[in-house]
Amino acid sequence: MADITKKQQKQLHPDLVENGYLVLKNFFTEPLCHYYNMVTFQMLESPQASGYLPGSNGVNNNNSGEHHRTWNTYGHPIWETTLHLMQLSIAQAAKNPQSGIPPQLFPTYSYHRMYMEGAAMAHHSDRPACQVSLTINLGQTHEWPIYVTNLKTKKYTEVIQKPGDALMYLGCNVGHYRPPLKGDWYSQLFVHYVLAS
């Protein structure tokens, strides 16, 4: 497995190592998701959200940008705080139950994306800073599947998340994508970690 040593694999949940992902139902509570969405919609209504510039916060409504029909925030204080506060809970969820010892995770970055109708996510795997990643559904108007490559079967698996559900995945190893969104909006938080050597 690229980028993750045998020693690191032994620290991780066997399903995470074998399949490349774990579904964590109700990882965030409903009130927490509601709060995060309230903050997101307040940010969307702010003057800074008008006009998209590639690589910055804003809504990308044209076809030339990397993330068509999305509004993105990278490293915002609320998401960075969440990245650090959830570190131990994420390590607990990722641990190998046989050892009982959570892996040591180092936070790398946080990212939030609000997808608008027609948005899609191209097939990709993540950069080296994303060894263990979570994508967390904060809210939606409609269900929207994410497809992840199952490392065992080498086939795509459809995952449907409800608000509060998290998908933990080995970001450098697992390809993933979303088809065009058939709904008004879908709010997703990404938190990324690397494993201690």
Where are these regions (language model features)?
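Short amphipathic alpha-helical segments
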Residues: 3, 193-197
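Short proline/glycine-enriched turn/loop segments at secondary-structure junctions
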Residues: 178-183
